[in-house]
Structures are given as C-alpha cells and as structure tokens.
Amino acid sequence: MCGVSLLVSSSSAYTSLKKARDSFYEDYQFADIFAEFKKAPFSIHHKLKSMPGVKLVQARILIDGLIYVRGQEETAVGRFVTLPEESKESLNKLYLRQGRFPELGEEVEVNVHEAFARAHKLKIHDELTVIIQGRSQKVRIVGIAISPEFVYALNPSAPMPDNLHFGIFWVPRKQLEYLAKMKDEVNSITLQLDHTLQAGAVIKKIDVLLKVYGNRGAYERKHQLSNIFVEDEIRQQKTMGMFLPSIFLLVAAFLVNIVIARLISLQRPQIATLKALGYTDYEVSSHYLKIIFVMMLVGTIPGIFLGWTIGSLLMNTYKTFFFFSDLTFYLSPLAILIGLLAGMIPCVLGGLFNLKTIFQLTPAEAMRPPIPAQFQPTFIERFELEKYFAIRSRMIYRNLLLRPGRLVALILGLSSSIAVIIIAASWQDMLDFVISNQFNRQQRHDVSVSFQNPLSESVMRELLRLNGVLLVEGYRNVPIRIRYKQYKREIPLMGRKNLNRLLKLIDKKLNQVTIPETGVLLTRFFDKQWGIKTGDRVVIEFLEGEFKEVELKVVGFIDDFMGLGAYMNDITLQNVLGEEPSYNVVNLKVDPVKLSEIYTKLKTFPLISSVIIKKELLRGFQETIGCMIKVFSSVMIFFALVISVGIIYNSIRVTFSERAWEMSSLMVLGFHRWSVFNLLAPEVMIQVFLAFIPGCLLGWLLVFLSVKLVHPETLDLPVIIYRSTFALSILFVLVVLAFSLMNIFRMISRLKLADALKIRE
C-alpha cells in the first residue's frame, strides 16, 4: 500500500505540475529569452523583432521600489513591471484572479501578484504608497493577478520567497514611465522565438545590439529565476517517484513472501490431502493465487486512494509557493494503471516464488511433519568457538543462520524503515545547519540596506550616526558575466574587505576564507559544475559602467549554500572599475531595542532600494521550507511505521508459528512463560539490531541522492545528518520492537498446552 500510494502521489504530482506548467506557459505566452539593460529607447523592440528567428518582442520597464503597507512596520520591496498589452502579440500575459486590468486615469491603478496580496490580505480598491526613484506615489489595486514569469515570486537578492516583504506589481506603460523617469524608454525586453534551438545565436545578436545601452546579459528561459525553481521541483518529483516507492515495493514483496510461505507451511497436511484426492498442482495453486490476488487488491486499491490523498495534500502545499493559473491534482488513468502494476509486482515476486513448494510436495511426504532442517557447521563450529557460547546462544545463532535468505531480507526491510526515517528527519537537520551557518556564522548583521546606485563612504558615516547602530560595513555589488571555456553565466560579484566582521566567507570545513589582493573567489558551484580549479583563469565582463572585460585568476572557493556569486578585494575591484571607494550595500549591527526606531529613520533615506531585516528573512525562510518539511516528514514517518510494524510483527508471527509446538512442550515440562519468552525474544532482537548499521548507511545514501536532486543554482546543500537523527530512527524501530515483543509474550501466555501432547503425525 505504501509503495503504491507513494508511486501514485509522486507520478500524479509530477503530471499535475508538468500539466500546469505547460498550459500556463503556453496559454499566457511565457517568453523564451530575457534581457535587462540600463536604458534604451522604446523603439529598440523594432530592431529586435527584425532579427531572424524572433517571433514576438515585448519591450518594458522593470524597476524596484519601496512599498508601505498598512499594518506592517517594515517596508516591502516591490518589483514594478510594465503591464502587458491585451493582444495576441503580448508576452508573459497576466491571469486575473480577481478584479480587472488597470486603466489610464488620474489615479495610478495596478495589478498586484497574488502571493503579496494573499500575505497582506489585500483586496480590490485597497491603496498602497510606493516610492520609485525617490518619488512617492499612491497606487490603487484594481486586480489580483499572476504571470508565467513569476510563478515562483522570489526577490533576486533573497534566498527564499518572502511574500510579506516582496511583491510584483504591473503598471500601465505611460504611468510607469513617469514613475521611473523613463519617458519613451525601456530597460528590459522579452522575446519569443520561432524555434527555441536558435536561442544561442539570437542571444549573441541581442548582446551585441544592447551593448551600447548597458546590457546586463540576455539569457534563456532555463536560467530565468522562477522557472529554475519550477523545473527543479518537477525534476525532483519525477526522480523521487522512482526510487522511493521501489523501497516500499521491495518490502511488500518480502512481506508477501513471508505470509504465503507461512500459509503453505501451516497447511501442508491439507495440501497433501487435496493432492491425494486427485486435485492437480495447478488447482491447489489457484487457491493461493486467489489469496495473492486479494492481497494485491487490499494493498493496491487503498494505496491508490491514499496516493490521491497525499497528492492532493502536496498540491495544496505547492499552492503556497507556485502560482499557476490552474494547479489541481490530476489522478491520471496512467497513474492508476502504474499503481495496479506496482501492486501486482511484489505480490507476484513474493507469492509465486513460494508456489513451487506445492509442485514439489508429494502427498505421502506432505502428510508427515516437515523433515528437520539440516544444520551444517558454521564458521563458529569450524573455528571451535562454540565453547564460548551458552546453549541458548548456540540455539539462537543456529536458527538465524538456518535461513540466511530470510535473515538478509528482514535486515534489508528494517534497514529501509530506518532509512526512510533518516530521510524524513535529515531535511530538518540540513535546514538547521544552513540557518546556523548562513544566517548566524556568515551573516552577523541585523539589517542590510541596498541603494539604487553606488554611494560614497559618507553614507556609511551617516548610517553610523543613527542612534542604536553599533557597526557599519559597506560592500560593492556589481553584476558580471563570467566565462570559462564553453560556459557563461550572469552572477553578482561583491567587493569587500578581509576584515569584515558582519559578513564572513567560509569554506566547506567552516573555516574563514580571506580574499587575496588579486584574483577572484567563486562559490563552490563553479568547481562542481564547471570544473574550475584553483589557479584557472576566467573572463569577467562587468555589466555596468564602462562594461570592462578582464581575465582573473581563481584563487579559491567558498561554500555558500544559496545561490551563485563571486568575491574580490574591494580595492582591487575599485582599481579595475576605475572608481573611487563606493558602496551600494551596507550591513548594520544594531541594538535590538532600537531596531524599530532605526527602521523608521531608514525609510527617510533617499535612493534606498531595499531594507532587509535578517530576523524577518529568517522567519520567512523557516516558514517556507518548514511547511514542506513537515508534510514530507509526516508522510515518510507514517510509511516507516507501517514498514517497521509489518516486518517485525510478521517476522515474529512466523517464528512463533514455526516453534509454537516446541514452546508448548517446554511449558508442559515446567518451563515458565518468561523462560520460553527469553528463548524467542533475543533471536528477534538480534535480527532487529543487525539492521541498525545497514539502515543508517542506506539512510545516508538516500539523503545523498535526494540532495543531489536539488538544483545547485537554487540550494547547494551539504549532506548533513545529525547523530540525533540516527538515534531517533533507531529509537523508532526499538519502540516498534518493544510493542511487538509485548505481543509475542501475550501469545506465549495464550498457548494451548494440550496441543503439545498431541501426536503431530
């Protein structure tokens, strides 16, 4: 049931996400190529449209500003985008959830992204105050919308969605031109191609054309921020839907094998009688085939319904992150068919394997008790080690080694249970590790202030004078394009000092990394994915100012878990750019008591593009990831419970049924039920204990594989599993074992001693 439900839920979630993506992208014409630049005349779109292979072009303004929301002390960052025209040639069209599209008039009307509206409970006709390019303006919400460009609404400067402090707004072109001070000008274009295979050639032409306008680099849809997260989740669902259910299906095959083997063993006399009366092997086998078929239905049908429930729950969780026009759980006929086949496979593997016993049984042989198993000397006897074992210990290890196949299967099954718990808990471990290192060890500031343009050192002195500000550090962020062999990528480069105390760089061993006076430091992504090594040279093209191009030596790597980036010594960067000392990002360490007062004063500073309070960012990060982890962990732990109970309980039942006559005989001879219990319990406990180490190793392997499924551009997570997680998984199995042993003691107490006095023949 567990394997079927996981397979159905994962495959259906994959199908549902893919279907929602494809229909939304196609119906609302998601662009193939994107480009941002400093400023260009609106007429640039005519030149772009005349390029071979270009089907549609949309020129627009894309600019960030501050938003004042009633009831929220902190300002939010708004990304203001030109409203797409209502025509067939528009790209990245809006899907209206509520209201209407904005119209030109005395008031500035806007459409707001559903994520921001939902977070603040905004309604149609609500008013907000925004500041764009230092100009304050009241805007009225007339519609709540979504777009294929912002399915995953993420601030490019933040690692995770924070819908309380970041929102998308669409404004009519003329009004946005006025607010952005860009009359008849644009700073962003999107294109749709006749054939996406032409993307590389078209991008080269776009870069050449836009170079004089301060081009920051054109890029394909696959590098678009929202699309990266969408594709990453779809890919994870597809892969996880393959290897996780396989674990449960193998366990199911083992359980079916145990049940059928036990039935055939207990019913040997009846099988012999039927065969003696003339029933053929196939007729007797058909009885067990029917049992297998019923077991398949009992496991598969509820599994499909449980898969539908889990898939629906998963879709509801996705709706808080991914904003599609229609994201509904789609249980396809193919998923149902796959579920039925998946339920059939373990039954066939586990059941038919035992049916050969029926064909091998002759009536005369089956009417007698089974021939005692032939014990052969083990390595303990060969090395004469048995003298160090008590009689009871010899009985235990001989019983364990009598059926090595069953022992190995049981260990693998319990190992799967332990591994599933480790997978479920490890994501919380990795989340805690990232928070501890990214937000506490590396980022030691309380507030981060970004400016629209680089400012002189005087801005740091001005911020330091604010009451409650304890420490100020400035950085220079520059957009660059890095090139190495056939690779190229647009990333931010930060110029900083080595003595910075509020933003530290660390390596994978959590040691602080210093920036040499020459060269560039890169995030670990470029080592893993591009194969860049220390000492290699890369080409850095600066995407602002004079658009200089330099070749720099890679002097090392840092382990930043979120996003891509590069780092240089600030003085070296100033020399390369030919600038005086300037900063466009300033981090503040503040007195927590004065944080509210400082934030209020920061609102009055001109040219601020965003103010990020670390504790709010951390809270949003924990809520965003924590929600997904809770759903995932709950499902996995439930399935682990089913596996543990199924394997341990069935194993005990089989062992008990095989040795019930011997246990009854011992009790007739005067053994107390505790003494009989102590003969059986250690054997079961040893089998469980033998699964601990393989289970932990399997858990680590599965965590490693699941981490590798995450796109390295979104989260470059290390494989972190705390000791407490291993202990928790083992404790979980021990609790199941304890309840199972209590049950076996109860069964021993209820043994009918008269059965031991009967002649077995």
Language-model region placement:
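Juxtamembrane segments of multi-pass membrane proteins
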Residues: 26, 32-38, 391-517, 521-525, ...
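N-terminal Sec/SRP start-transfer signal
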Residues: 1-2, 263, 280-281, 289, ...
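Membrane transport/envelope proteins' first extracytoplasmic loop
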Residues: 1-250, 262, 281, 438, ...
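Short cytosolic juxtamembrane segments of multi-pass membrane proteins
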Residues: 361-378, 747-761
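Short helix-to-coil transition segments within interhelical loops
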Residues: 273-282, 361, 400, 667-675, ...
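Small-residue-rich transmembrane alpha-helices
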Residues: 253-265, 269-272, 293-325, 333-360, ...
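A hydrophobic alpha-helix feature that marks transmembrane segments and, especially
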Residues: 7-14, 238-273, 284, 425-429, ...
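Alpha-helical transmembrane segments
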Residues: 1-30, 261, 310-318, 360, ...
